[in-house]
Amino acid sequence: MASVVIRNLSEATHNAIKFRARAAGRSTEAEIRLILDNIAKAQQTVRLGSMLASIGQEIGGVELEDVRGRNTDNEVSL
């Protein structure tokens, strides 16, 4: 298993994690591990639409032409 050292973590963040861990009956280390695991799992389940939207935002947005027809006069024969 890998080990990670986090330097310069604010006291407020450390206290918040300790409080969250204590409330869940876990150690601070176990709580941090759970938080990181949840983030890693969420990253793996990114959907295509979300990924494309993120790319669009990174490049400043994209204007797409509306290509749907506006004519509603055609009857549909089933």
From Swiss-Prot:
Biological process annotations from GO: migration in host; regulation of DNA-templated transcription
Mutant phenotype after disruption: Disruption of the fitAB operon leads to faster transepithelial cell trafficking of the bacterium; mutants adhere to and invade cells normally. Mutants grow normally in liquid culture but much faster within human cell lines A431 and T84; these latter 2 phenotypes were observed using MS11A bacteria with a disrupted fitAB locus.
Keyword Transferase: no
Family matches, as InterPro entries: Arc_rbn_hlx_hlx (IPR013321), FitA-like_RHH (IPR053853), Ribbon_hlx_hlx (IPR010985)
Keyword list, A-Z: DNA-binding, Toxin-antitoxin system
Gene3D superfamilies (alphabetical): Met repressor-like
Entry GO MF terms: protein homodimerization activity; sequence-specific DNA binding
Pfam family, one: FitA-like_RHH
Assembly notes: Homodimer in the absence of FitB; forms a heterodimer with FitB; 4 FitAB heterodimers form a complex that binds to fitAB promoter DNA. The complex is also seen in solution.
Function, as annotated: Antitoxin component of a type II toxin-antitoxin (TA) system. Plays a role in the speed with which bacteria traverse human epithelial cells; disruption of the locus increases the speed of trafficking about 2-4-fold. Binds to its own promoter, binding affinity of the FitAB complex is 20-30-fold higher than FitA alone. No nuclease activity was observed for the FitAB complex, perhaps because FitA (the antitoxin) prevents metal binding and thus catalysis by FitB.
Name listed for the protein in its UniProt record: Antitoxin FitA
